[in-house]
């Protein structure tokens, strides 16, 4: 299954001018069968999907609940949580990475760095946590290897 793991939608993020229905249509045209909504520090985009579209439209397309979490010491981290798990704490930025990893794993979620080699202040490899303990990378479940908003040498 081909899934876009890092999606911002206008219903939940100022980082997007594309609504979720248009996004799904574009992804389908490019051969994707799913997406993870990962708006910054909010589940509002996913909530919109769940309330207005889930089970009504695009039933052949998988939409997963995610968030792009802004850590205190490790840049942006993509977090994917199971459908039934409610964690409002993830909508409050600033948790240290080690605590975030423990919290997500204890509640059945997975996580990994977003654009890990990209922008200086938002990327894991430029963050304090990586320099202090690079072995923490072993605790990630995945690593984003391509981000269309980053320059070629960052991917």
What are these regions (language model features)?
Residues 109-110, 128-149:
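Catalytic pocket-lining loop regions of alpha/beta-barrel enzymes
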Residues 36-37, 112-113, 144:
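Conserved beta-strand positions in the central sheet of alpha/beta enzyme cores
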Residues 1-106, 150-155:
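A metal-dependent hydrolase metal-coordination microenvironment
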Residues 81, 113-115, 147:
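Short, structured patches in soluble enzyme cores that scaffold and shape functional sites
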Residues 49-51, 76, 119-136, 155:
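Distinct, well-ordered alpha-helical segments
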Residues 93-128:
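Internal catalytic-core helix/loop-beta-alpha segment
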Residues 118-119, 148-151:
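Short acidic, S/G/P-rich loop/turn micro-motifs used as interaction or catalytic elements
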């Amino acid at each position: 299954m081909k899934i876009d793991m890092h999606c911002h939608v206008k219903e939940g993020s100022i980082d997007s001018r594309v609504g979720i229905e248009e996004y799904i249509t574009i992804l389908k045209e490019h051969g994707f069968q799913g997406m993870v909504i990962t708006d910054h520090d909010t589940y509002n985009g996913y909530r919109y999907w769940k309330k207005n579209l889930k089970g009504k439209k695009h039933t052949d397309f998988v939409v997963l609940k995610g968030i792009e979490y802004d850590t205190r010491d490790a840049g942006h981290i993509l977090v994917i949580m199971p459908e039934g798990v409610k964690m409002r704490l993830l909508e409050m930025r600033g948790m240290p990475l080690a605590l975030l990893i423990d919290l997500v794993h204890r509640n059945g979620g997975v996580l990994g760095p977003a654009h890990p080699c990209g922008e200086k202040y938002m990327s894991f490899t430029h963050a304090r946590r990586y320099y202090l303990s690079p072995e923490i990378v072993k605790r990630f479940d995945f690593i984003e290897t391509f981000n269309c908003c980053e320059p070629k040498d960052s991917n």
